[in-house]
Amino acid sequence: MVVKKIALFGATGNTGLTTLAQAVQAGYEVTVLVRDPSRLPSEGPQPAHVVVGDVRQPADVDKTVAGQDAVIVLLGTRNDLSPTTVMSEGAQNIVAAMKAHGVDKVVACTSAFLLWDPSKVPPRLQDVTDDHIRMHKVLQQSGLKYVAVMPPHIGDHPLTGAYTVTLDGRGPSRVISKHDLGHFMLHCLTTDKYDGHTTYPSHVYE
């Protein structure tokens, strides 16, 4: 099936904003769920539909997923490193809504820390990483076509489209531009070769 309509969760984060812009420019009809619509860009590419709500509210998620062909998940906690369940709760609601509406493809971003020895995760990032782990398990057990994107450090470098994607392990670099990360998330909608895999996009920038 050709994906034309997508739900984007986490659209107002750094990677979310560039993914939204690239998706609209690529011709996708994008629906976003946001708590604060004022965080969406006032100029440039705009989502086709904006649902104001919270990913922890099943009804808000259901409204966002209905009628879509695929889902992109870029949920995060910004700079809040305290214990959280927002990503795993959100993933549970997203999976339930996808099953209810017959949507079977999801591309979800967590973190490269899931590829590390757990004892090497920096203590200050442990709580967020724990919720990423819970979120990943929700996807693994969903029965859906899921792509788990586990990026290294996310930088501000320009879009290259020339990044390396390593399956089920870590790659040649410890950085990926937010623009290249968004590009890869969208690329995953056009192929099934990453379905069921963990993917590590990275690039050696100039």
Swiss-Prot record:
Which CDD domains does the entry link to?
A: BVR-B_like_SDR_a
Q: Which residues bind NADP(+)?
A: 10, 12-15, 35, 38-39, 54-55, 75-76, 78, 87, 109, 132, 153-154
Record keyword ATP-binding present: no
Q: Where is the active site?
A: C109 (s-nitroso-cysteine intermediate), C188 (s-nitroso-cysteine intermediate)
What UniProt keywords apply to this chain's record, in alphabetical order? Answer: Cytoplasm, NADP, Oxidoreductase, Phosphoprotein, Transferase
Which E.C. number(s) belong to this protein?
1.5.1.30, 1.3.1.-, 2.6.99.-
* Record text on subunit structure and interactions: Monomer.
Q: What does this protein do?
A: Enzyme that can both act as a NAD(P)H-dependent reductase and a S-nitroso-CoA-dependent nitrosyltransferase. Promotes fetal heme degradation during development. Also expressed in adult tissues, where it acts as a regulator of hematopoiesis, intermediary metabolism (glutaminolysis, glycolysis, TCA cycle and pentose phosphate pathway) and insulin signaling. Has a broad specificity oxidoreductase activity by catalyzing the NAD(P)H-dependent reduction of a variety of flavins, such as riboflavin, FAD or FMN, biliverdins, methemoglobin and PQQ (pyrroloquinoline quinone).
Q: Which InterPro entries match?
A: NAD(P)-bd_dom, NAD(P)-bd_dom_sf, Polyketide_Oxido-like
* Signal peptide positions (record): none
Q: Which organism is it from?
A: Bos taurus (Bovine)
**Which protein, by its recorded name, is this?**
Flavin reductase (NADPH)
In this UniProt entry, the residues modified to Phosphoserine are: S42, S82
Its family remark reads: Belongs to the BLVRB family.
Of the GO CC terms on this record, one is: cytosol
Keyword Oxidoreductase part of the UniProt annotation? yes
